[in-house]
Amino acid sequence: RKEEMIRAFAAAIADLGEYIVGPDMGTDETCMGWIKDEIGRAVGLPRAIGGIPLDEIGATGLGLTAAIEVAQEHAGFSLKKARVAVQGFGAVGKHAARFLAQEGAVLVAASDSTGTLADASGLDVAALIALKDSGRSLHDHSSGKKLGSDAILDAKCDIWIPAARPDVVHAGNVHRIKARLMPQGANIPCTLAAEQTLHERGVLSIPDFIANAGGVICAAMEYHGATQALAFQAIGERIRANTQAVLDEVRGGFQPREAAMRIARGRSMNAASSSTSCRHSDSSPTTSSSTVATCDRS
């Protein structure tokens, strides 16, 4: 039934030539393969058909880790032995935990749809990933305290990663966050009011479209024929640069999302200006192909 529905969706958007589909909550590499089969436009494809499986390799989690590496000094801690809590131990959260563990961080709490698992001395990230990959829940793990899903908000940690659903942190519960850094792994996981409260408390919140862009960057690289190695390189370079740009603005007095939006608007305006210049720089029939190519790349 799911395959039938996804193929029907693909057929419905067949004429939207600029709409390139990628995976998100509820879909995976196999689903993208069905869409590719129907309309020829999809990213995050299975390896078997030449794609880069975004969720399997943890592209978004890698990007989150890059953002955290840049932000750690600003937030006032060292990543090595930093305590991490992850809300939503799925395609994004589990890989973020894996990459952070490789950097010496310690996972002290994680949650999924069944509840929260916590251990102040540290949880075995590899064991939890194996558990989830086998179709079981965090509460099936033999160690750690089993708590309700909401208990993840109270985790004592340096890094609190929302990697589940939108609007999970809001005015009614933001006071429960006890972290120094919140890199947003999910899309819009924090309301604007809650972000402002965090900022006033000195908690650095890295906006979603900065911190969780690893999947989108990887998808764009895949679409243009890049290898996984090149995609990973691009994720690291771009997210580190974007995070640093936001932090530079924050030091100037801006709230993180305000800073990120200022940067995004500036780049969009520059891109639009460059595009207009390319279209109008020479309207004669003798415009060289090299000039057109240069404009296309800018």
What do the PLM-derived regions correspond to, one by one?
Residues 3-14, 32-36, 61-69, 97-101, ...:
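Predominant activation on well-ordered alpha-helical scaffold segments within soluble catalytic domains
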Residues 19-24, 43-45, 86, 109-112, ...:
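General beta-strand structural signal in soluble alpha/beta enzymes
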Residues 55-156:
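Glycine-rich phosphate/diphosphate-binding loop of Rossmann-like nucleotide-binding domains
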Residues 27-28, 112-117, 211-214, 265-267:
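Glycine-rich beta-alpha junction loops
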Residues 1-79:
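Glycine/serine-rich phosphate-binding loop and adjoining beta1-alpha1 elements at the start
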Residues 293-297:
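Short, intrinsically disordered C-terminal tails of secreted or membrane-associated proteins
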Residues 72, 180-289:
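Adenosine-phosphate binding glycine-rich loop
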Residues 115-205:
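Rossmann-like adenosine-cofactor binding region
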